[in-house]
Amino acid sequence: MKIIIFLIVSSLMLIGVKTDNGYLLNKATGCKVWCVINNASCNSECKLRRGNYGYCYFWKLACYCEGAPKSELWAYATNKCNGKL
């Protein structure tokens, strides 16, 4: 019984480590996925990419996703956008 509880707790910890919050990445352009006050489209796009919840971050005009894998998120360090849309 202790082993089962240990395995469940370990699995939950691993799942938590592999997810992150951030702007969704448009893999074709390397840019953030843009939006204009459309939470529904950002939420569905986030869920398609295995995230929990997504919304349109108004000031950045980009979809923000919570709980998505890091491979689906835009990162400043690996930014390849250069103004392309």
From Swiss-Prot:
One Pfam family of this chain: Toxin_3
Subcellular location: Secreted
Domain (LCN-type CS-alpha/beta): residue spans on this chain: 20-82
Disulfide bonds: C31-C81, C35-C56, C42-C63, C46-C65
Keywords recorded for this protein, A-Z: Cardiotoxin, Disulfide bond, Ion channel impairing toxin, Neurotoxin, Secreted, Signal, Toxin, Voltage-gated sodium channel impairing toxin
SUPFAM superfamilies: Scorpion toxin-like (SSF57095)
Signal peptide range: 1-19
One GO term (biological process): defense response
PROSITE patterns registered for this protein in UniProt: LCN_CSAB (PS51863)
GO MF term (any one): toxin activity
Tissue distribution of the protein: Expressed by the venom gland.
Keyword Secreted belongs to the record: yes
Superkingdom, taxonomy of origin: Eukaryota
Chief location category: secreted
This protein's GO CC annotations: extracellular region
CDD domains documented for this protein: neurotoxins_LC_scorpion
Entry-linked Gene3D superfamilies: Knottin, scorpion toxin-like
Signal is among the record's keywords: yes
Domain notes: Has the structural arrangement of an alpha-helix connected to antiparallel beta-sheets by disulfide bonds (CS-alpha/beta).
Function recorded in the entry: Beta toxins bind voltage-independently at site-4 of sodium channels (Nav) and shift the voltage of activation toward more negative potentials thereby affecting sodium channel activation and promoting spontaneous and repetitive firing. Competes, with apparent high affinity, with anti-insect and anti-mammalian beta-toxins for binding to cockroach and rat brain synaptosomes, respectively. Also competes with an anti-mammalian alpha-toxin on binding to rat brain sodium channels. Has a weak effect on cardiac sodium channels and a marked effect on rat brain and skeletal muscle sodium channels.
Family membership: Belongs to the long (4 C-C) scorpion toxin superfamily. Sodium channel inhibitor family.
Protein name per Swiss-Prot or TrEMBL: Beta-mammal/insect toxin Lqhb1
Provenance organism: Leiurus hebraeus
